[in-house]
Amino acid sequence: TAEVAPHHFTLTDDAVKIVVGGPMMGVAQFDLHAPVMKATSGILVLTKDEVAENPETPCLRCGQCVGACPLNLMPTKLARYSQLNRFDDAEGSGITVCMECGTCSYTCPANIPLVQWIRLGKQKVLQMQKERTAVK
């Protein structure tokens, strides 16, 4: 459960990043106290040499994320709507359809964390939908 690392494996001193859930759809952890559940698909521990330090730069409008999206969504548009708190627009553009596979972020030459912004926007849209349903 909560403290798997000390009980089941030993981290070396050069471990700098821990990702729970796998390399594509996983979430970086900030400490070792994150719970590991039955549904946790993997734990990835990276050293400094394995972590790319590529800073985020402005969007180039190259369209690589759009071409990579298996659902033919427009990740840059969805992420931008999330950044601007335009959740109605995000909903209208199909943000809830996104399966959060991460291919958009992986292919982005500007290193924009598209899937993280989309995930945030999707949570907000789902919350709005739930509130609308509760009001009726």
Question: What are these model-derived regions, one by one?
Answer:
Residues 1-110, 115-127, 131-136:
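Redox cofactor-anchoring modules in respiratory/redox and cofactor-processing assemblies
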